[in-house]
UniProtKB/Swiss-Prot annotation:
Gene3D superfamilies: Acetylglutamate kinase-like. The gene is pyrH. This is Uridylate kinase. Pathway: Pyrimidine metabolism; CTP biosynthesis via de novo pathway; UDP from UMP (UMPK route): step 1/1. Its EC number is 2.7.4.22. One of its GO terms (molecular function) is UMP kinase activity. GO terms for biological process: 'de novo' CTP biosynthetic process; UDP biosynthetic process. Its main location: cytoplasm.
Amino acid sequence: MDRPRFKRILLKLSGEVLMGQGQFGIDPETVARVAREIADVATHYELCLVVGGGNIFRGLAAAAKGFDRTSADYMGMLATVMNALAVQNALEQIGVDTRVQSAIPMSTVCEPFIRRRAERHLEKGRIVIFAAGTGNPYFTTDSAAALRAAEMGCDALFKGTSVDGVYNADPKKDPTAIRYETVTFNRVLADDLKVMDASAVALCRDNNIPIVVFNIREQGNLARVLAGSGTATTVQN
């Protein structure tokens, strides 16, 4: 299926993508590769990013082990700021003008999230990286990605992960699992397909923002998926 071309997109990167082959933290070579993938398409689109923090700290997992949930979630938000700065650094090293905006104000390291300012950055050809989730506990970075995509008027939300789309079962556990080319938001919610958390999916559904799930670990795949030729799943109404 040929996916339509878009003008403004939001790219959600899971924190785990930045680990490379490691089990924790940030792998500079992987971040540099991802930055090159982004730079290759940045001249054709107005591009925003949301980066997860799971490679450094997972609030939900920490809460399950006894951390106060609110404190754990704030720690997870701070982890996303570290990742955002790492991606910004990698992009600017290859000449891509970038701004980081945080939902939690920290003026010494990045801008606060101001939608109108973010709009101006995009209009000037800069990439805007949104950090610190929504700024509120109990919300995932998937929800933050959906929220920012809606606020910024993005035409689509691209989720770059370590899998090549959405399956009707876990392909790592079930060899007969089938990958969807397209699937509706309502099917994702009804069947509890693991695309994003339910609040993020519902927000995209209600604002008619398609979600494209693809494997960003595969070199060159971001450009192929944006062109409509890569392997991915599109979630839409």
